[in-house]
Swiss-Prot record:
Subunit structure: Component of the 40S small ribosomal subunit.
Protein known as: Small ribosomal subunit protein eS21
Naturally occurring in which organism (per UniProt): Ictalurus punctatus
GO MF assignments: structural constituent of ribosome
GO aspect biological process, one term: cytoplasmic translation
Gene: rps21
Length: 83
């Protein structure tokens, strides 16, 4: 959608679950969004960037949120692959 100035504006952009790729609805109050900080490998300090993951309520309800976050962190090389 464009406004009068020709800029693209969206009123609502739905979030998607990072683990299951489902759309997180507005009434899904059990869903979470977590930011995991990226750290410098030498100093161990926060470098100003982070990865954002959204987990829907259905994944949390099944008790799979921790496994899903670990899998996502391994895929993004935040956690080592041999854990």
């Amino acid at each position: 959608m464009q406004n009068d100035a020709g800029e693209f504006v969206d009123l609502y952009v739905p979030r998607k679950c990072s683990a299951s790729n489902r759309i997180i609805g507005a009434k899904d109050h059990a869903s979470i969004q977590i930011n995991i900080a990226e750290v410098d490998k030498v100093t161990g300090r926060f470098n100003g960037q982070f990865k954002t993951y959204a987990i829907c309520g259905a994944i949390r309800r099944m008790g799979e949120a921790d496994d899903s976050l670990l899998r996502l962190a391994k895929n993004d090389s935040i956690v080592s692959k041999n854990i």
